[in-house]
């Protein structure tokens, strides 16, 4: 779809856009974090970030549960075993072996194409390009014990 429509969907979702056809979450990626992102991410994931979006597969890399957004914390929080990820899918806590997995992204002429045939492993534990901490209460209790 159109990049403007994708951004509008994210804003309507309180910072989280879910695209069921792609089985993907899309969030806004802050331009101020791009220097750090360029050291961690490669194309075609970086292409989305350079166009202001992060695209993550809906499944937790721990055991494959669908990871919902948590409006109060501003993070993704897995209800199965408590893994937590910041708004751009970088691991913050829990048993997951890495951040949320990614899809390749192309943005051409204002059109966004999510390549669901190109699934890439999420970032390593400890990657936090945006510095986003929890913005409020967590939706899943007991998460701190899994660090």
Model-derived features with residue positions:
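Extracellular/periplasmic metallocenter environments
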Residues: 59, 63, 77-88, 99
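N-terminal pre-ligand scaffold of iron-sulfur
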Residues: 1-61, 65-70, 103-147
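Short cysteine/histidine-rich zinc-coordinating motifs and their immediately flanking basic loops
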Residues: 70-76, 89-93
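Short proline/glycine-enriched turn/loop segments at secondary-structure junctions
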Residues: 91-97, 103-104
């Amino acid at each position: 779809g159109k990049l403007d429509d994708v951004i509008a969907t994210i804003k309507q979702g309180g910072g989280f856009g879910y695209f069921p056809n792609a089985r993907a979450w899309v969030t806004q990626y802050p331009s101020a974090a791009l220097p750090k992102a360029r050291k961690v991410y490669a194309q075609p994931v970086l292409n989305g970030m350079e166009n202001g979006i992060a695209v993550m597969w809906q499944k937790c890399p721990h055991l494959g549960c669908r990871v919902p957004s948590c409006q109060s914390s501003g993070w993704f929080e897995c209800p199965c075993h408590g893994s937590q990820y910041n708004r751009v899918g970088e691991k913050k806590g829990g048993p997951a072996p890495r951040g949320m997995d990614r899809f390749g992204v192309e943005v051409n002429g204002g059109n966004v194409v999510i390549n669901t045939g190109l699934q890439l492993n999420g970032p390593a534990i400890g990657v936090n390009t945006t510095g986003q901490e929890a913005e409020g209460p967590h939706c899943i209790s007991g998460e701190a014990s899994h660090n």
